[in-house]
């Protein structure tokens, strides 16, 4: 997941869903009259951070995009970092530095939190990033076929050693029958108020197998060497076929193949109220 240029070319699903989330929930954000401090967690190449700016007041104070990958941050700073927008390395599951604590009025995160094993630690850090009266808007994966494909491949002799720790890279909510309840419980425990959690089923159609393979390669969390990556992607497609996720349709040119994924996304809006108002 460190190839920023490949991610930029292959993140159409992530950008589409971030845009939908903002269209649906941006009106809930409690913007200040001037000088909003905003942080985007898991910014990757910075392209979604650019989308976020469209929904922010023009007189915002600063926008900080963060990612655990140094390569992603370098790419984002080069292509999107200017003026009041900057990017830095941050592990949201790690310790926050003093300059980050209570340093923001709004926290956004799109397609990142499902990679985090310690969910309570991540939500507590989000809470601590916010100043009083701050709020957050988050979007992450629940159940999705990509995780089932990973699991299937991890049980094969060929790929077991490479995918030995597969559960580290599967959403904590993939097998949860009531993710809304679980997320809300964690956030209440951390201290959030006005919590709204929605789990929705969406679908996305990849136009052909090559597009799917590039998308899988762009977010591949496993340390698979380049010389066998194509082999891994071919086996990935074979599992997709076995799971009957391929839709074949005929047209005037000939037979084409599209891949339709149904998956669940979890959206969250919540606030950090001042203690005197609680």
UniProtKB/Swiss-Prot annotation:
It catalyses: (2E,6E)-farnesoate + S-adenosyl-L-methionine = methyl (2E,6E)-farnesoate + S-adenosyl-L-homocysteine; juvenile hormone III carboxylate + S-adenosyl-L-methionine = juvenile hormone III + S-adenosyl-L-homocysteine. GO terms for biological process: juvenile hormone biosynthetic process; methylation. Keywords: Methyltransferase, S-adenosyl-L-methionine, Transferase. Disulfide bonds: none annotated. Specifically expressed in the corpora allata (CA). InterPro entries: Methyltranfer_dom, SAM-dependent_MTases_sf. SUPFAM superfamilies: S-adenosyl-L-methionine-dependent methyltransferases. Pfam families: Methyltransf_31. Its EC number is 2.1.1.325. GO terms for molecular function: farnesoic acid O-methyltransferase activity. O-methyltransferase that transfers a methyl group from S-adenosyl-L-methionine (SAM) to the carboxyl group of juvenile hormone acids to produce active juvenile hormones in the corpora allata, the last step during juvenile hormone biosynthesis. Also able to methylate farnesoate to methyl farnesoate. Belongs to the methyltransferase superfamily. This is Juvenile hormone acid O-methyltransferase. It comes from Bombyx mori.
């Amino acid at each position: 997941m460190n190839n920023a240029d490949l991610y930029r070319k292959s993140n159409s699903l992530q950008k589409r869903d971030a845009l939908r989330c903002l269209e649906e929930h941006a009106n809930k954000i409690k913007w200040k009259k001037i000088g909003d401090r905003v942080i985007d967690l898991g910014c990757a190449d910075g392209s979604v951070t650019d989308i976020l700016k469209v929904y922010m007041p023009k007189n915002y104070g600063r926008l900080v995009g963060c990612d655990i990958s140094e390569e992603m941050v370098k790419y984002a700073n080069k292509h999107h970092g200017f003026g009041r927008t900057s990017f830095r390395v941050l592990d949201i599951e790690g310790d926050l530095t003093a300059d980050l604590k209570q340093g923001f009025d709004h926290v956004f995160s799109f397609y990142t939190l499902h990679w985090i094993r310690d969910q309570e630690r991540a939500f507590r850090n989000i809470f601590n990033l916010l100043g009083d009266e701050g709020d957050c808007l988050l979007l992450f994966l629940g159940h999705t076929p990509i995780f089932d494909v990973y699991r299937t491949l991890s049980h094969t002799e060929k790929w077991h050693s490479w995918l030995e720790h597969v559960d580290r890279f599967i959403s904590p909510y993939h097998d949860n029958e009531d993710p809304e309840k679980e997320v809300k419980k964690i956030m209440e425990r951390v201290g959030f108020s006005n919590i709204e959690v929605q789990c929705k089923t969406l679908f996305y159609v990849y136009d052909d197998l090559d597009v799917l393979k590039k998308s899988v390669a762009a977010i591949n969390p496993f340390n698979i060497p380049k010389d066998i990556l194509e082999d891994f992607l071919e086996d990935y497609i074979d599992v997709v076929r076995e799971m009957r996720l391929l839709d074949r349709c005929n047209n005037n040119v000939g037979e084409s193949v599209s891949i339709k994924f149904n998956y669940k996304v979890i959206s969250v809006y919540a606030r950090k109220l001042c203690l005197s108002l609680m």
